[in-house]
Structure formats: C-alpha cells, structure tokens
C-alpha cells in the first residue's frame, strides 16, 4: 500500500518585492534578473514565522481534503529555515493546528519536500498511518545576504502542503545525495563554545551558480529518464512535470535535453522566486487549484538542492 494526494495548499506572505525594488539597494536590474533567472518578484515574510506559514498552507490542504487535524497520524515538515533548532517546525505546525500526532522535520534543502513524500511512503507501506500531512515551509529571507546580488535576487518565502491518504498514487521515486558543501552551503553561524578553535562562518547562503546549474540540469533529466524507464513509459507519456523552481533557464535546458515541450513543465518562478523546500509544494498546489490536474494523470515531481541532493517521484493523480 502506498498513498494518494487528496488535498493541497499553499501560502505566500503578502509583501511582494520586485526586481525594481532590489535595484534600489544593490547593483542589479529587472532585465538582468529576468534574463538570467526568470524571476520578476518574490514574496518576503515581514512578521510570519516558518511554522506559521506552514500552518496556513497546511490548513488550506486540510480543508481541501476534508480532513480534520485530529485525523492526522503524522506530520512531516521539510525546511532549512526553522524558527528554532529545537523544537521542530513540524512540532510548531502541529501545535497551531491542534493536532496530536507525531511530527518531525526533514532537512534536505530544496529537495526536502520530495524526500518528505518518500519518507511518508514508508509509513504507508508498513500500514502504520492512514492520513499524513507533508509540508514544505521556508523563510529563506532570513539567511540571505541582501548585499550579494548573485543570491539575494533568487530567493523568496512561502509554504506548501499536501494531505496524503492510503492509495496507489505514489508509483516510484529516486532520492540521491552527493556529499559535499562546496557548491551550496549554509553554515550554522552558531558557536558558543570557548573550546572550539575553528572560525565560525555567518549563517548565510553560499552558492556556486555555474556548478549548481550543471548539477540541476543533469539531475532533472537523468531522474526523469530513470523513473520512466522503470515504469516502462517514455518522458512523452508524462502529463505534467513539476520541477523545483530555482532558475527558469534550468528548466529550459532540462526540457531540451529530454526533447520535451516546455509546456509540459509547470513554472511559477516568475512570481515567487526560489522558495527551497516549499517550491514544489507551492507549485503543485497552484497547478491543482487551477484545474491543471485530472484523475489518472501521471506527474513527476523533480527537485535538486544542497547536499548536494536530488529527489524525484512519479505519482498518479
């Protein structure tokens, strides 16, 4: 037994920061950002925590699925920007919902939401859960260097969620980690020990753009081919592909490598930027609520991120 998705939700904070807004504080322009990344604006949290945004996305997903918080058997939250090291983001969402089930976090950067889905699949396979809430929520703005034009223009805040129940909709997956911190790195920025001798780096995002780009294009195309080969289908047979929204040019290159029309890929990076672990969850909810998915559709969710990591899954709607 696996699972099927019965409800999705998303939340974006109200403050919109445009490329022109950023151009007032750093050396950049709307044209530069749009051509290189495909982003026009992003949402930034002014007073909402990671858990609070996750709660709002979760609440919408629960309503869409007709599920009460007390019906949940498990909550998994994917995030790298938790409000505290302890307790967990999932625990904060649980409290806000008034749920009583176990709740824990997964930290796998932008791949986190798909890692969380794959983790949930194991609980369903063992028959220990009937309804699971999976959330991706990020307040990336708090770890961005807003003076670095190569990174601050990319990211945004937000949350997405999905409610899962028993079913046969989760067909296959591929999750990978390529250990190393030289391409995408966020130091903890914390050291109170008088005995630790190494210099402590500030907890802000460091990213090697070209290496990230190459890795992303290769992982998207290879993971999609892998899942299709195992299912005995071709990429052309996939109805929709929901990729991590990191850079529209990555999606363009992956589509060309797979010889697929770009229209098969759902893209919303223009309005929200890269929301890390929330990215695919937000995109899936938007596609769902716009009526872009129908029963029986074969969908691939495909992500890549720090770790380095990648995660893709084949689901039937």
Task: Cite the ranges covered by each PLM segment.
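A contiguous, well-structured pocket-lining segment that forms one wall/lid of small-molecule binding clefts
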Residues: 200-269
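Conserved small-residue
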Residues: 5-7, 33, 61, 75, ...
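Conserved beta-strand-centric core segments of catalytic alpha/beta enzyme folds
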Residues: 1-19, 117-181, 284-317
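Active-site-adjacent elements of ketosynthase-type condensing enzymes
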Residues: 22-24, 81-92, 131-152, 175-196, ...
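Conserved catalytic cysteine-centered active-site region
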Residues: 34-36, 40-52, 79-132, 256-284
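Conserved beta-ketoacyl condensing-enzyme motif
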Residues: 5-7, 48-108, 228-252, 257
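Beta-strand segments within the central parallel beta-sheet cores of soluble alpha/beta enzyme folds
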Residues: 33, 70-78, 104-107, 130-137, ...
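Condensing-enzyme catalytic core mediating Claisen C-C bond formation in acyl metabolism
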Residues: 1-47, 148-214, 218, 222
């Amino acid at each position: 037994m696996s699972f099927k998705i019965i409800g999705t939700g998303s939340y974006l904070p109200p403050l919109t920061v445009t490329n022109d807004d950023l151009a007032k504080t750093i050396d950049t322009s709307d044209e530069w950002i749009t051509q290189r990344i495909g982003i026009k604006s992003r949402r930034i949290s002014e007073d909402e925590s990671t858990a609070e945004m996750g709660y709002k996305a979760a609440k919408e997903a629960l309503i869409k699925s007709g599920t009460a918080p007390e019906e949940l058997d498990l909550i998994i939250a994917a995030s790298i920007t938790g409000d505290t090291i302890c307790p967990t983001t999932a625990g904060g969402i649980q409290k806000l919902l008034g749920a009583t089930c176990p709740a824990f976090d997964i930290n796998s950067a932008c791949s986190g939401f798909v890692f969380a889905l794959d983790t949930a699949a194991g609980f369903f396979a063992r028959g220990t859960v009937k309804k699971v809430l999976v959330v991706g929520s990020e307040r990336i703005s708090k770890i961005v260097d807003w003076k670095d034009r190569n990174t601050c223009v990319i990211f945004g805040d937000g949350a997405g969620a999905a409610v899962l129940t028993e079913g046969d909709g989760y067909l296959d997956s591929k999750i990978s980690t390529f250990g190393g911190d030289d391409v995408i790195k966020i130091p903890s920025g914390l050291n109170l020990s008088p005995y630790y001798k190494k210099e402590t780096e500030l907890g802000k995002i460091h990213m090697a753009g070209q290496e990230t780009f190459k890795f992303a294009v290769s992982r998207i195309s290879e993971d999609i081919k892998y899942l299709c080969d195992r299912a005995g289908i071709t990429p052309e047979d996939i109805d929709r592909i929901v990729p991590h929204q990191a850079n529209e040019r990555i999606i363009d290159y992956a589509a060309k490598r797979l010889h697929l029309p770009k229209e098969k890929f759902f893209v919303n990076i223009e309005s929200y930027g890269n929301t890390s672990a929330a990215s695919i969850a937000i995109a899936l909810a938007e596609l769902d609520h716009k009526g872009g998915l129908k029963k029986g559709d074969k969908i691939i969710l495909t992500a890549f991120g720090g770790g380095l990591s990648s995660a893709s899954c084949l689901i039937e709607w």
